[in-house]
């Protein structure tokens, strides 16, 4: 049996790690009287969750080209509690503001109209932001059916005065599910204003740590034990015995650059009502694949073979492979300069439909974009155009027997994502695909262990 670890011990260990390892400032906001405003947060209303001084100074620093009155007016839009909206709708709206900024209009010194995006967070340079861990912050309840007057989260992680991460802790002898059922659920009901800006929630009793989104059910919360490598050996029994699960999550996700990367590129909404978070293996795997993409892209134009092979992204069955594709494509579109086209190739109608729907339902592709060709002829036409995304069955690369497959595009910024690329029965179709897209790069996704001939087939693709 693991030694008993109190909630306070877990909290203090986390704050120490956040301060000395992850680069956070730490603020203890506890007061004996919940209504006491003298808690160090700088708030003038206990219903507020934003830290006004931190928020304002960061916004002015990150947007020197925007007049101060315009900045302050924009921040008022962020502060709005959006009481007429559902919590998930409010969170989705603010998620867009955090990621893309707040659109503002103003006149410059010469009276010329200007339009800018006011940045709340600098996602490209962590050092330009302020990271703060606030513990024991009393918040006045605003929920219509609130069960208490005040609530006090254990730890909140702030970036530029904006609470992005909620952390609820329990003694090590308390079942972790109670942190979800008894705390997080009640907090969303009682202090919904805290979750309008929330990126994700963390629950821990040291023996076990899980994270999830504000829309996630308990069974959708997941662990985070690997730090840098999907192949890292994990001794779960030893981690539970030592009570270090939260330390591993902090090391793997709370480092400042990683936290910003996760919030910017690994959080999305599905059908506008379900908030989806990348799991541990997806975050590491997508970033590894993206690093390979950037490395291959840096090869000289003479090294065409190296540029065209992006490797294999291996997934266990049922571990969110199609969402990994979504995260991968979205991050490249957002972070890399280029006019990329992604062609997602599968061999079954159900897979093609599932992957397309996940791209569609996350807003990564639009219904009006006409990204699914109906037949081989339409596929060839699509690939000759400058579409951002195309989803197709490999069978649509069929061509008249004995005829040479035509070159459809010589662009070198086409990326073909091949699902289950080890399947060997499509050799001639794969040859047609390569002939039609001679300069494309290839990334293979598979959920099946590769052996012998299958490994060779996948190697030829990626």
Regions found by a protein language model. Give the residues of each.
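A generic local structural motif
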Residues: 187-189, 329-331, 375-378, 401-405, ...
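ATP-dependent helicase/translocase motor core
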Residues: 1-341, 350-366, 385-388, 395, ...
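Conserved helicase motor
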Residues: 346-349, 369-378, 394-399
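Conserved motor-coupling elements within RecA-like helicase/translocase cores
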Residues: 374-390, 407-408
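Proline- and acidic/polar-enriched loop/turn elements at helix boundaries
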Residues: 29-31, 371-372, 447
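Signature of the SF2 helicase/ATPase Hel1-core->accessory helical subdomain module
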Residues: 176-177, 213-215, 222, 395-405, ...
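Conserved residues at beta->alpha junctions
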Residues: 170, 346, 420
């Amino acid at each position: 049996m693991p030694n008993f670890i109190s909630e306070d011990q877990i909290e203090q260990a986390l704050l120490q790690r956040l301060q000395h390892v992850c680069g956070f400032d730490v603020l203890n906001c506890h007061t004996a009287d919940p209504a006491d405003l003298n808690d160090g947060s700088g708030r003038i209303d206990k219903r507020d969750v934003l830290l006004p001084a931190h928020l304002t100074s960061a916004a002015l620093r990150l947007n020197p080209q925007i007049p101060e009155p315009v900045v302050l007016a924009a921040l008022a839009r962020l502060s709005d509690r959006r009481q007429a909206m559902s919590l998930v709708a409010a969170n989705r709206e603010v998620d867009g503001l955090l990621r893309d900024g707040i659109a503002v209009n103003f006149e410059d010194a010469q009276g010329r109209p200007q339009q800018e995006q006011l940045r709340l967070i600098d996602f490209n340079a962590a050092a330009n932001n302020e990271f703060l861990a606030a513990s024991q912050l009393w918040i006045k309840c605003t929920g219509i059916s609130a069960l208490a007057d005040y609530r006090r989260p254990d730890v909140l992680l702030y970036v530029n005065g904006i609470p992005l991460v909620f952390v609820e802790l329990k003694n090590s002898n308390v079942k972790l599910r109670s942190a979800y059922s008894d705390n997080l659920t009640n907090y969303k009901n009682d202090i919904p204003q805290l979750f309008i800006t929330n990126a994700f929630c963390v629950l821990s009793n040291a023996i076990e740590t899980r994270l999830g989104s504000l829309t996630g059910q308990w069974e959708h919360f997941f662990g985070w034990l690997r730090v840098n490598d999907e192949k890292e050996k994990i001794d779960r029994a030893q981690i539970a015995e030592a009570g270090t699960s939260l330390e591993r999550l902090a090391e793997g996700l709370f480092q400042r650059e990683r936290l910003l990367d996760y919030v910017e590129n690994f959080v999305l909404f599905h059908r506008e009502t379900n908030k989806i978070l990348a799991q541990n293996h997806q975050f590491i795997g997508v970033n590894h694949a993206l690093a390979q993409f950037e490395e291959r892209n840096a090869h000289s134009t003479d090294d065409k073979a190296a540029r065209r092979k992006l490797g294999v992204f291996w997934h266990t069955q049922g571990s969110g492979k199609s969402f990994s594709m979504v995260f991968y494509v979205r991050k490249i579109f957002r972070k890399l300069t280029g006019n990329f086209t992604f062609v997602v190739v599968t061999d079954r109608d159900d897979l093609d439909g599932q992957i397309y729907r996940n791209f569609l339902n996350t807003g990564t592709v639009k219904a009006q974009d006409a990204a699914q060709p109906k037949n081989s002829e339409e596929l060839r036409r699509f690939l000759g155009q400058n579409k951002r995304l195309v989803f197709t069955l490999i069978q649509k690369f069929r061509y008249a027997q004995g005829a040479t497959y035509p070159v459809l595009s010589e662009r070198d910024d086409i990326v073909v994502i091949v699902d289950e690329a080890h399947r060997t029965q499509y050799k001639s179709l794969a040859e047609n695909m390569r002939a039609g897209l001679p300069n494309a790069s290839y990334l293979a996704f598979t959920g099946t262990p590769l052996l012998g001939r299958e490994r060779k087939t996948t190697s030829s693709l990626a």
